[in-house]
Amino acid sequence: MLILTDRENCSGHSRNLVSQQLLDTVQHLHCESVLLDFQRPPNPELEAMVAAIVQALPCPVAVTEHYAAGLNCPVFLPPCPLHISMEDYLTPWHNREIWLEAALSQETITVTEGGSVFTPVYSMDSPSGGFYHQKLRCRYHTALYYDRILFTLFDTPETLEEKLEVALRLGVSRAVGLYQELGGFLTGM
């Protein structure tokens, strides 16, 4: 799998030239699939480039949800937020081929009189212990403070494996994760 990002701005480039160069690269490297992991907000120029790439390549090309509308290709979704069940998360995409990012995630939910705030936590250190939440398929800790309640939701290798098994049963065709984060965990996915 060849993964392309839009970390560098893609605007101002010929979509035909980019598509041809990418086709040459895919053929040279014998890539079986391509993932366009584009996170920048869509604009007409970039949408046209993504559509041209999807059309030009002979292998499956997955695109992020920002670029999926109107394209006949797999959609690549970020990890399921921990406060949403996998079933609810995948429902809007039930008629599409889905590639799902696999990652050990953490999230905090801060509950105050004013409402709730959901915040992703980006850390390589994963908490341990805690309680298991059946529907969300994650573990959690709670902390009570004078003015708020803090829930820390987190994945373990076991809960991530359980989520991915559910995702595969719900029609996800591929789980994509970084070896640096997951090691050999995704070998069978």
Region locations from a protein language model:
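Conserved, mostly hydrophobic/aromatic
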Residues: 36, 100, 167
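Glycan-binding loop/region signatures in secreted carbohydrate-active enzymes
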Residues: 95-163
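Active-site region of glycoside hydrolase catalytic domains
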Residues: 46-52, 56-61, 88-110
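Chitinase-like catalytic core of GlcNAc-active glycosidases
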Residues: 1-78
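Acidic/aromatic/glycine-rich contiguous surface patches that form carbohydrate-binding/processing clefts
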Residues: 163-189
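Substrate-binding cleft/loops of secretory-pathway carbohydrate-active enzymes
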Residues: 63-85, 107-120
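Short, acidic/polar
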Residues: 11-28, 85-86, 155-169
